[in-house]
Amino acid sequence: MMVILRPGPYVCAEWEFGGYPWWLQNIPGMEIKRDNTEFLKYTKKYIDRLYQEVGPLQCTKGGPIIMVQCENEFGSYVSQRKDISFEEHCSYNAKIKGQLADAGFTVPLFTSDGSWLFEGGCVAGALPTANGESDIANLKKVVNQYHGDKGPYMVAEFYSGWLSHWGEPFPQVSASEIARQTEAYLQNDVSFNFYMVHGGTNFGFTSGANYDKKRDIQPDLTSYDYDAPISEAGWITPKYDSIRSVIQKYVKYPIPAPPAPIPVIEISSIKLERVVDALLLAQSIQPVNASTPLTFEQLNQGYGYVLYTRHFNQPISGILEIPGLRDYAVVYVDGEKIGVLNRNTRTYSMEIDIPFNATLQILVENMGRINYGSEIVYNTKGIISPVTVAGKEITGGWNMYRLPMDKCPVLTEFGDNVCRNTPLQAVQFKDRPVIYEGEFTLDQPGDTFIDMRAWGKGVIFINGKHIGRYWKVGPQQTLYIPGVWLRKGENKIVIFEQLNEVPQQNVNTVRKPVLMNLK
């Protein structure tokens, strides 16, 4: 199998921050995606290290890599960042290409952009390829224009489906349309790369987000099924069969049969034996104190949650406003839930009444950094601007408790705070963030999908593996668990449930994903 490598350093791909490490934002003088000394220093480090791993695998050295991409859809960024001169954009783009060449990449280099954005995305010496281009005559016209009147002609991203956001319908593209376009490419000697041919999963906190003026942020699902020809779990679909039938007409050998289906199991009930109130974690975590709320980055935390608290010696009431919320917050006073603020719905304020000697608690979640477009440069998380009540900024006495949740919480570390998850305790913990824990035994592991339709919002760990976020708004209501992460015998599950509006005693898995249930 031959490989076309698209290494970035910017990859987009609905990945958190487009593949950039969050801590770049903490480096003084750093400006990403431009001709900036600090940024280019780190891109060079990355590319040089990348070459150590994959350089020997180029076809020029007997390996499978036949092409390497420079940057990614840079033309769209150029079109959105008119505040940066076109000359600087071109200089940056050329320097990334130069770093790839200097590192030792000798296979052909290429760029990928929408065909109408080639002017900003193309770089001398690299083949321009088009993303999402179905007009073959136009494809050949623009490639000729920017590549010396010659091909080859390639669609680097032929969209077999589309990306999915929380709170929005799951996009679908018909199998017949994909088959028709596949045949058109083959008839006209156009190379193409299905994006995606195989769906996947944004495990952990790796899913990114888009920016939208109406919704501000559009967080991506954990599932990256993409309505692809091969599903998230590796299942062939009618779309795959349609594509296979078309391709068979253009090759002189029989295409091998698809592999046998992966075993799938169903777990009818997993009892969640133990529970801990996450608001009590402040008793076991050393807080960071500041006069104003600090961002995740200032707290040296990339992902997960931060609990912001502030004690009041005098009563105060009115409108609580957090215009700089990034991205989702559940607000409590002395552990009693007051409401939810949500950047995705542009809900930044609520009525609040804080009595004498009470504590305001704000549990803030990073829902994923923007991975595409000009807003990628504004990606700090947490509370990034003043908090006000009745128009008055609340300063002094802020405590911040870091809950990164990048690793599975170990409930035994919380001592006496851990309770048996009985019906009585469930009522007591209603509307409070909790961590559930349980065990289950399997005779034979297999792929499965954990069913979260009865739950609210949170993350799940299976045998220590972070399988991602769930959220009742949908459309995704199940999370994929690869069978290789399950064991014959005892297995452990840990669930962090942020809302706990309907406390649970059990959870189950199903044999098929639920990806189109929007609430």
Feature roles, as predicted:
Residues 317-332, 360, 440-463, 470-471, ...:
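Aromatic-lined ligand-binding clefts that engage carbohydrates, nucleic acids, or primary amines
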Residues 216-217, 223-225, 239, 293-298, ...:
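A cross-kingdom feature marking solvent-exposed beta-strand/loop segments within repeated
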Residues 275-309, 405-436:
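Edge strands and adjacent loops of beta-rich recognition modules
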